[in-house]
Amino acid sequence: MVNDTFEQALQNAINIARLAPSSHNCQPWSVHYDAATRCGEVSIDRQRALKGLPSLEREMLMSCGIFFEYLSTLLKHSGYPLDWQWVGARQNGSSGMLISFAPSAPCVADLVAYQQWVQRISDRHTVRTAYQPTQVNEQQQAQLYALFDRSPVTCDIKYGEATRHDVAFLTANYASLDFADQQAWRETYHYIRFNEQQAAEDGFYLHHLFGPVSCGFRWFFRIAFHPRLSWLAKRLRLPASMAKGLAELVVEGPQYLALSLEHESDENLFIAGMKLGQLWLMLQSWGWSLHPLSVLVQHATARCALADTVRLTGLPVFFARFGQHRQSGIPTPRRAWQRILTTTQHSFSPENGADVKQP
């Protein structure tokens, strides 16, 4: 790694940063780098971004923020810190470009820090099973809060029996909204991989949600929750049953955290993602995990009820339970780095004296 060129270091960093978490594991990021100008950009890949609910744009921006936090930190530790600036997706129409970047002056690589980040990113998985009852202590809380100093992001940490029952009550009442919006559920269903013997590059298998499941359960879920059979699922009260089961898990906590923004701009959501990426790896270094409860922030009614009931600083853009995991999570499918990075090389054409771009 010490003698890597920037281009090689970028490939290596993307190969690790691609393990960043994202909603439905849709991996909505893309990177382009121009070798001649030594400039690059990170964009939302609109072909991959979730669109089922307007609120999912928040999650796409935050997911890209997590990815860039991992990418830029790995490059810094490999000796290539980045200069970057916010450009903004909506100002660029369909391009989805979020930030532009360029390598700044090279520095001495920190191989120990690099390997620590590689290990933590590789070991980090979303854990949706029960956690140990271990309570977050004051020192740990201070470390988590410190991550958000001098940032537009506010972090609230909540715990206690009353909070656990409040969050479980909200989950039981609102989690069935995952199935209520036909377009949103159709999109979710699209990312479920039912054949565990077939390799995939995105999405998730049922065992990521429920742990090991039988072939019979997979077939039942595939049919009963098919978007075209939503009437059957409702008649069998399956959404309510799923919500009740999730609430029984959520009530165990043992604690919860929320991120909110005073000004909910695209740039601040991206920064919130970067900070969340740091927080997730800090928890990983403790042997702890996060379980996002996205349904409580994706729907306006649930989001307002959560903020009021749990007395959050503001409307949450992210909410999760967290704690010391009893067992590590399971890796999810991933795209190869070659599917994320595109490059432009410039070569001189002696016939016409013009630059020739080579994808």
From Swiss-Prot:
Keywords: Flavoprotein, FMN, NAD, NADP, Oxidoreductase. GO terms for molecular function: oxidoreductase activity. One of its GO terms (biological process) is antibiotic biosynthetic process. Its cofactor is FMN. Disruption phenotype: Cells lacking this gene show a white phenotype, and produce 2-methyl-3-n-amyl-pyrrole (MAP) and 4-hydroxy-2,2'-bipyrrole-5-methanol (HBM). It is an enzyme of class 1 (oxidoreductase). Its EC number is 1.-.-.-. Belongs to the nitroreductase family. Involved in the biosynthesis of 4-methoxy-2,2'-bipyrrole-5-carbaldehyde (MBC), one of the terminal products involved in the biosynthesis of the red antibiotic prodigiosin (Pig). Catalyzes the oxidation of the hydroxy group of 4-hydroxy-2,2'-bipyrrole-5-methanol (HBM) to yield 4-methoxy-2,2'-bipyrrole-5-carbaldehyde (MBC). This is Probable NAD(P)H nitroreductase PigM.
